[in-house]
Amino acid sequence: YTNPELTTSEPYVMGSHATCSGAWVSGPEDIAPDDYFWGYNRMMSVEGLFGAGDTVGGSAHKFSSGSFTEGRLAAKAAVKYIEDKKANNIKVSENQYNNLKEVIYKPLENYTVGRNEITGGTVSPSYISPIQGLQRLQKIMDEYCGGITNNYMTNDNLLKKGLELLDWLQEDLENVGAEDYHQLMRAWELKHRALTSQCVTEHTLFREETRWPGYY
């Protein structure tokens, strides 16, 4: 046994947190100017779509504490949106419900089938675990999209390579496996993080004039 070597850093969720990117959302009613408030806190310019954390612009430093706090604010506003009956026109058929249910629980099925093909430890050619996918996502975002490995800097070529690797990861996430409901939650967290990572990377690629390294 040897003592682990640590590189202490901020508690960021993904290596891309130091970017000037993100979607435009409504501010809180009590302090936001009229131009920055359109009905519900953290609602994007798309009606009924709420965002928080790395998906939202306005601040480059979306650390863990700020992200989950903003997520709580967005969730409360989304509940109020529903309570105000703004979502009443949304109709969901029984067929849509069943299809969505099948998609949500698919990681459990992936594991049930793939566990019989495990070649060693938790390695299976048929599925990847949420932690395996998360480590892969972290490596992509850290090395190509402005993480600590590159001193929070990136460029056109790195971002394009990062998007290519994220596309490959999305293909593999169709086969993410979950052995229980906790892992099912982790699987969907991973899918949402991967989608957020793609959005942030595409946005950073577009904003050539503000593709800046963090911590100026």
Give the residues covered by each predicted segment.
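An anion/pyrophosphate-binding glycine-rich loop and adjacent beta-alpha core
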Residues: 1-16, 64, 68
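Glycine- and aromatic-enriched mobile tails/lids
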Residues: 18, 24, 30-216
